[in-house]
């Protein structure tokens, strides 16, 4: 059948305008354009990656339902930020589309080639902001990417949470794949390495496990500090490391502390981890934090006043992940509310950095259980009900923020949970706060109550 794409999209916009609130329509829907209709696939272009992700998360089903209603048959919606060049579009803007029983992407559709599942597309060298705090780590990572297995092997990236270690590791992987697409680049967490080892033991397939990891051209292992206390994992990793190193393959490790400060680390592993280069990453200074925010806003096609950039940068001095999350939260809030982008308007939704007061684990548990109307036994139990799981994750997050307990100790407080569960919970709550303003408010209120209880 013949469809004028512009006319189709006009009809879609008319219907969505009636279904959605004006701020939602103006912010997210009106700014998008229909680019191509082919083989039952409608390509919609968003103005920037942030808008694309928002449409994907909240409105893609609504759009698909409206298009289905207009055309009389279902289509697959593909969201992109790329301008699609369609050789089949004629001078009048007409696209010929044949009704087919299956939804497939047209062969003329320009789609970026998929990345390996374990590499984040955002973690490229081009998107890494270099400052005094990370200059050596960046230079070493680039050198390793250009000539793996040579000067710095292993490269040991060391620094606190959210300072860019994972970004640099994955940037190395991307760089190698850009030059040699068939390179064997393995990026894994220590937890995954351990889990793969356990699975191999259970299935009596240790040889396959060893062959898999020792086939790597570049092995990137994140959070290597979690190898502490795992004797068999350390044994296997030692031999994997030796095999790769002797073959001239590159090993890159990341940790929140240097090798000699990882408890229960075998001396021979500590020696090997230290035989290359240990590159320390410190918290960024104010100018670097502002540069990070500016670069992120440029990639997302966002324009922010300098005073807003500086205000956000001053509120998050030590964690880049939190810094970027705050920017996302600010842009989301301004987009939804329709308010001008000013310091006065964004200040209430940024979690205030109040003086940290040491709280007892019991105080955190009490405040969280009361807020979610749950018993302490519920929080410490193993129920996977959604509301209990969320409360437990919030509790772990707040305990990490308000106490000096280690991850394993926090796990003990919550009924003997593993430290990896605690880490996952803390990361989960941090990520949710980037898009859930209600959760941001809840965390702020609970933090205030915990601080209040610590003073009295």
From Swiss-Prot:
ATP-binding found in the keyword field: yes
Cross-referenced CDD domains: AAA (cd00009), Bac_DnaA_C (cd06571)
GO molecular function: ATP binding; ATP hydrolysis activity; DNA replication origin binding; lipid binding
Subcellular location: Cytoplasm
Annotated ATP binding sites: 162, 164-166
Region feature Domain I, interacts with DnaA modulators, mapped onto this chain: 1-73
Acetylation is among the record's keywords: no
Bridged cysteine pairs (disulfide): none
SUPFAM superfamilies from the UniProt entry: P-loop containing nucleoside triphosphate hydrolases, TrpR-like
Major subcellular site: cytoplasm
Function: Plays an essential role in the initiation and regulation of chromosomal replication. ATP-DnaA binds to the origin of replication (oriC) to initiate formation of the DNA replication initiation complex once per cell cycle. Binds the DnaA box (a 9 base pair repeat at the origin) and separates the double-stranded (ds)DNA. Forms a right-handed helical filament on oriC DNA; dsDNA binds to the exterior of the filament while single-stranded (ss)DNA is stabiized in the filament's interior.
NCBIfam families given in the database record: DnaA
Domains as described in the record: Domain I is involved in oligomerization and binding regulators, domain II is flexibile and of varying length in different bacteria, domain III forms the AAA+ region, while domain IV binds dsDNA.
Designated name of the protein: Chromosomal replication initiator protein DnaA
Species of the source: Trichodesmium erythraeum (strain IMS101)
Chain's gene name: dnaA
């Amino acid at each position: 059948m013949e469809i004028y794409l512009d006319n189709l999209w006009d009809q879609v916009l008319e219907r969505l305008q009636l279904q959605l609130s004006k701020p939602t329509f103006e912010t997210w829907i009106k700014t998008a354009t229909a680019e191509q209709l082919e083989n039952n696939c409608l390509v919609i272009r968003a103005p920037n990656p942030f808008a694309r992700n928002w449409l994907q998360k909240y409105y893609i089903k609504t759009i698909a339902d409206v298009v289905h209603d207009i055309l009389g048959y279902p289509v697959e919606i593909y969201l992109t930020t790329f301008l699609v060049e369609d050789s089949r579009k004629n001078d009048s803007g007409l696209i010929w589309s044949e009704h087919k029983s299956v939804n497939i992407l047209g062969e003329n559709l320009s789609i970026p080639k998929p990345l390996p599942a374990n590499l984040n597309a955002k973690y490229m060298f081009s998107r890494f902001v270099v400052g005094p705090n990370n200059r050596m780590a960046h230079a070493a990572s680039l050198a390793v990417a250009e000539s793996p297995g040579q000067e710095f092997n292993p490269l040991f990236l060391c620094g606190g949470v959210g300072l860019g270690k994972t970004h640099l590791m994955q940037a190395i992987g991307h760089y190698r794949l850009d030059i040699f697409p068939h390179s064997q680049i393995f990026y894994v967490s220590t937890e995954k390495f351990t889990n793969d080892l356990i699975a191999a033991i259970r299935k009596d397939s240790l040889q396959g496990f060893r062959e898999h990891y020792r086939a790597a051209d570049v092995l990137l292992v994140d959070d290597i500090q979690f190898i502490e206390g795992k004797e068999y994992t350390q044994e296997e990793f030692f031999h994997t490391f030796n095999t790769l190193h002797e073959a001239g393959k590159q090993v890159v490790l990341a940790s929140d502390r240097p090798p000699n400060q990882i408890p229960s680390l075998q001396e021979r592993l500590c020696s090997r981890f230290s035989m290359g280069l240990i590159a320390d990453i410190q918290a960024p200074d104010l100018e670097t934090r502002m540069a990070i925010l500016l670069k992120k806003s440029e990639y997302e096609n966002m324009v922010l006043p300098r005073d807003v950039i500086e205000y956000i940068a001053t509120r998050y001095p030590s964690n880049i992940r939190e810094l970027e999350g705050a920017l996302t939260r600010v842009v989301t809030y301004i987009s939804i509310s329709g308010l001008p982008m000013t310091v006065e308007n964004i200040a209430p939704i940024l979690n205030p950095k109040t003086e940290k007061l040491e709280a007892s684990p019991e105080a955190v548990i009490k405040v969280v259980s009361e807020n979610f109307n749950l018993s302490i036994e519920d929080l410490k139990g193993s129920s996977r009900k959604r509301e209990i799981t969320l409360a437990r994750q919030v509790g772990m997050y707040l305990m990490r923020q308000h106490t000096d307990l280690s991850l394993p100790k926090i796990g003990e407080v919550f009924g003997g949970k593993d430290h990896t569960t605690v880490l996952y919970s803390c990361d989960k709550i941090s990520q949710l706060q980037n898009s859930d303003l209600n959760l941001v408010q809840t965390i702020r209120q609970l933090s205030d109550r915990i601080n209040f209880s610590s003073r009295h």
